[in-house]
C-alpha cells in the first residue's frame, strides 16, 4: 500500500515538474491524431469523388486507335467482344486562331465517355461546338470560333468555323494544365471541344471506346480494377494482333486497283498522244510537199497558196505546242504514278494501339490524380510511426 502511494506520488510529481513537456506531447498527439484522420479519409474521399464522376460520365475502360483508322472489319471484330460495350468515334487535332494553340475536337459520344455540361448546351446541329470549361473566361456562348488544320494534310473537318453552344468537362481529360501532346500547332494540347460526328470528313472511325461489365462496380483506383483492366487489355491486344497485316492487304489491294485505273488512263492518253504526233508528222510532210510546189504555180496562185501555207503552219505550230504540253503533263503524271506505286509498295503495317485511362492521349490528369491519391494513402500509413517516434524523443 505504501509502495503504491509512493508510485502515484512520484508520477504526479513527474507530471507537475514537467508540465511544459507534458502539454507539448499532449498537443502533438492531438494535432497528429487530427492530421492522421485527415490523411486517412482524404484518399478514399478523392477516389469516391472520382468514381462518382466516372460513373456519371460513363468513362471508358479501354480505347483502341489505329494510325489508319478502324475499318468495317475492325468494327465488326470489336463489336463481338463478350462482356464489353463499344462505341466508335472521331477525333482530330487542329489549331485555334493564333495557329499555335492546339485543340482536340471530339465527335459527340452518346453512351461512353460522355461530356458533362457546365454551361449552355451540347451541339445539336452542324457548325456548333461545345468547348472545354476552362475556356469560359475567354469565350462566351453564341460566339464564333475558327480552326485551322495542318497544312498538307487531308482535311478532317467539313467546316472550320463553329458557333459556341456551351462549355463541358471531358470524361477522359481530367487535367486543365497537362493535357499531353498534340498533332498540331506547338505540339502541346491546350484545350478540347465536341462537335457532331457528321462534321468529320473521314471515311473510317479513328477511335473505339470500350466499357466492360465486370469493371463497372469496382473502385477505379483499386488493385482489382487494375488487374482486370490489364487482363482485358492483353486479351484485346491479342485479338488485334493480326489486324495490321490483314488491313495492309486490303489497303494495298484498294490502292493497287486505283493505281491500275490511273495507269490505264495514262496508257490511253499516251496512245492518243502518239496518234496525235503521227498526224502532226503527216501534216508537216504535206506542208513541205505543198511548199516545194509553190514555184510551179502562176504568180497570183502562188501568193494565195503561200498565204494558205503560212496560216496552216501557224495552226500546225499551235498543235505542236499542245502536243508538247501534253507530253510534259503525261510525263509528270507518270512520275506521280510511279511515286504513288512506290509509296504503296513500301506501306508499313497499320499499327493498333490499346489504351487504358492513364495511357490514352490526354490521360495525364488521370495518372496524376491516381498518383496523388496513392501518395496521400502512403503518407497516412507511415505517419503514425513518425508521430510516435517524435513523441518518444
Regions found by a protein language model. Name each.
Residues 3-392:
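Membrane transport/envelope proteins' first extracytoplasmic loop
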